[in-house]
């Protein structure tokens, strides 16, 4: 679904060279923006299971 695609995009962008990405800060961004993402943003997130 769309969330899985978004998740994959986040991980791909991170892997492509956002050096020093702070996943603790990244994980908190959706809440600061008033958006609820039902999965954790981290390198170990399995995007195929995100719905």
Curated annotation (Swiss-Prot):
Coiled-coil blocks: none
Superkingdom of origin organism: Eukaryota
Disulphide linkage map: none
Single GO MF annotation: lipid binding
A biological process from GO: defense response
InterPro entries listed in its UniProt record: Bifun_inhib/LTP/seed_sf (IPR036312), Bifunc_inhib/LTP/seed_store (IPR016140), Plant_nsLTP (IPR000528)
Any Pfam family: Tryp_alpha_amyl
Keywords assigned: Lipid transport, Lipid-binding, Pathogenesis-related protein, Plant defense, Transport
Entry function: Plant non-specific lipid-transfer proteins transfer phospholipids as well as galactolipids across membranes. May play a role in wax or cutin deposition in the cell walls of expanding epidermal cells and certain secretory tissues.
Family classification: Belongs to the plant LTP family.
Other known facts: Causes an allergic reaction.
Name of the protein in question: Non-specific lipid-transfer protein
């Amino acid at each position: 679904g769309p969330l899985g695609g978004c998740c994959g995009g986040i991980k791909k962008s991170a892997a492509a060279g956002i050096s020093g990405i702070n996943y603790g800060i990244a994980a908190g961004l959706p809440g600061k923006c008033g958006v609820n993402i039902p999965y954790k943003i981290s390198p170990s997130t399995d995007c195929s299971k995100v719905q």
